[in-house]
């Protein structure tokens, strides 16, 4: 499953793993959309292997036990895991998100 998540996370400059109906997922994808980022979005509750991918994302976010909070949204920029909502929003407020998006080729501003 780790290889599958890695492959999907690298398919575009920005990849977001979400679940339908998740308000934090909507907040992150809305922010990226307002920044004119065309992210690949994978809704895990609509993926055949979504539960397994969610466990892998939790492991990546919170360590080997995979416990510590929700696994979605999980945001990858340039193939690297950035984090969840709090990390992405904090980076945006600090002015760090846009430069990272530019470096990954997700923005042309």
Swiss-Prot record:
Per the UniProt record, the lineage of the source organism begins with: Eukaryota, Viridiplantae, Streptophyta, Embryophyta, Tracheophyta
Q: Please give the Pfam families that the UniProt record associates with this protein.
A: Glutaredoxin
Q: Which SUPFAM superfamilies match?
A: Thioredoxin-like (SSF52833)
Cysteine pairings via disulfide bonds: 22-25
Note the superkingdom of the native organism: Eukaryota
Transmembrane stretches in the record are: none
Q: Which gene encodes it?
A: GRXC13
| Protein's job | Has a glutathione-disulfide oxidoreductase activity in the presence of NADPH and glutathione reductase. Reduces low molecular weight disulfides and proteins.
The protein here is known as Glutaredoxin-C13
Where is the Glutaredoxin domain positioned along the sequence? 2-108
Short motif Responsive for interaction with TGA factors, span: 106-109
Instruction: Could you list this entry's UniProt keywords, alphabetically sorted.
Output: Cytoplasm, Disulfide bond, Electron transport, Nucleus, Redox-active center, Transport
Q: Which family does it belong to?
A: Belongs to the glutaredoxin family. CC-type subfamily.
Cellular component terms per the entry's GO annotation: cytoplasm; nucleus
Q: Where in the cell is it found?
A: Cytoplasm; Nucleus
């Amino acid at each position: 499953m780790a290889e599958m998540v890695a492959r999907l996370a690298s398919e575009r400059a920005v990849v977001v793993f979400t679940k339908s109906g998740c308000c934090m997922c909507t907040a992150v994808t809305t922010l990226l959309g307002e920044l004119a980022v065309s992210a690949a979005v994978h809704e895990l509750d609509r993926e055949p292997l979504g539960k397994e991918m969610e466990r892998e994302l939790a492991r990546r976010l919170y360590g080997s036990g995979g416990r510590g909070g929700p696994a979605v949204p999980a945001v990858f920029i340039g193939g690297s895991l950035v984090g969840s909502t709090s990390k992405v929003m904090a980076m945006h407020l600090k002015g760090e998100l846009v430069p990272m998006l530019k470096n990954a080729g997700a923005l042309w501003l």
